[in-house]
From Swiss-Prot:
Keywords: Glycoprotein, Secreted, Signal. It comes from the Eukaryota. The keyword Signal applies. Residues 1-19 form the signal peptide. Gene3D superfamilies: Zona pellucida, ZP-N domain. Belongs to the PLAC1 family. The lineage of its organism: Eukaryota, Metazoa, Chordata, Craniata, Vertebrata. This is Oocyte-secreted protein 4A. InterPro entries: PLAC1_fam. Glycans are attached at residue 128.
């Protein structure tokens, strides 16, 4: 009796693994979407909407002609989020509770999101010039381009994912005291 039960579960596992091409997983840094094709999962039985859940009891919330779908924020359903240096690993499972059987099937799902890194301003100091003061006459106005030249900020274009981004390379920023010099 135990052997037939084990063989039955192994057969179900094989059928599930073979049918995983019917599973679509999409994710972002804040949500997880899983679509399961409406095909028989076990013994030619097609799952019903109320027999499927994501994680800890989150029901199907998208019903399409060919798919059952789950779309939830990562803070729901007991979805596990593991943050790594370069990305986020998102893990959960689909629980299939067939009404005709005394056991549940668990289909693991996982998704990886690569982090987007922000533009970083890099500062490089100059030797023997850290005490430079900014001086300008009272009432003298300067354009932004002149201010940038004085601060030696040079714009450059970098390409990330084939999209040009404008970033600034800061060569040095003098420590300025807001002092005005009266020209007399």
């Amino acid at each position: 009796m135990k052997i037939s039960c084990v063989l039955g579960k192994l057969l179900m596992l094989f059928e599930l693994i073979h049918g995983l091409q019917d599973l679509s997983i999409t994710c972002s840094e804040s949500w997880l979407q899983v679509k399961l094709r409406r095909t028989p999962l076990l013994n030619d039985l097609q799952p019903l909407q109320n027999e499927l859940s994501l994680g800890i009891g989150c029901p199907v919330n998208m019903v399409e002609v060919d798919f059952f779908g789950f779309l939830y924020l990562l803070t729901f359903c007991g979805i596990r989020v593991s943050e790594h240096g370069v990305g986020i690993l998102i893990e959960s499972l689909i629980v299939y509770e067939p009404t005709n059987f005394d056991f549940n099937l668990h289909i693991p799902v996982s998704c990886y999101v690569q982090r987007r890194f922000p533009i970083i301003l890099v500062m490089r100091g100059r030797e023997n010039d850290s005490r430079r003061e900014c001086r300008r006459s009272v009432g003298q106005h300067r354009s932004l381009s002149h201010e940038l030249e004085d601060l030696e900020i040079r714009p450059r274009v970098s390409y990330v994912n084939s999209v040009p981004l404008l970033s600034y390379l800061i060569v040095s920023l003098p420590k300025c005291k807001n002092k005005a010099v009266h020209s007399g």
